[in-house]
Amino acid sequence: MRRYLIVDDNRDFAENLAEILRDGGDEVAIAENGQEALALARKTRFDALLTDMRMPLMGGAELVHELRRIDPGAAAMVITAHVADDALEAARREGLLAVLPKPVAVPRILDLLAAARRDGLVAVVEDDSRMSDNLCEALRGRGFAAVTAASVTETERLGPVEPFCALVDLRVPGGADGDALRRLRERFPGLPVIVVTGTHEVPPVPHQGYFTKPFDTAELLSAVERLHRERGQTVVPE
């Protein structure tokens, strides 16, 4: 059984979706705005949040931001008719599993909720935008959300997130090789790291796996899934 939080001021939509989920054996709470949702999140540990973006009192982007402070492990998905909304970009930086443009088919929502992984946030540090996008898409396909950084400086600007692991290219702009990894480790002590490198030399830093470009994405995802299963058990040398 899983617990979901649905936040939408369209009560009929929320009730219909909740009924389908409950029929499948899951627990569902409904809120009509972000403030109501946060009150529920303070009392209950949810596996995933599904929220509209534009609602009275508190919208979806602010809700995701505040939820990360209360329960950073909950997966978060957004439904919106305004995919170019500036506030949506802020929410993306805090690790969304999906952004679903309205109208969205209910089966698509159900599939995403079923796949969503609690404590499933991955930090991706890669300056090649195409590779970063491909990695994030592949991670989402396995139920993982991602936050990204393309430079050493950007690793310092990640939102109030708690990734369970990181995929890190050792050579990104803004510092010497390995600086981005060191900054991540300073911010997230003990964070398991999989190194993605363009050289065939074993990285001279503590890591839980390394992949040389070009690599087999399926093998990389298997390594991420292993770390997710073992989260909380892995002891990482500092």
Curated annotation (Swiss-Prot):
Residues 3-117, 121-228 form the Response regulatory domain. Member of the two-component regulatory system GcHK/Anae109_2439. Is involved in a signal transduction system responding to oxygen availability. This is Response regulator receiver protein Anae109_2439. Pfam families: Response_reg. It comes from Anaeromyxobacter sp. (strain Fw109-5). The modification 4-aspartylphosphate is found at D52, D169. Keywords: Phosphoprotein, Repeat, Two-component regulatory system. SUPFAM superfamilies: CheY-like. It comes from the Bacteria.
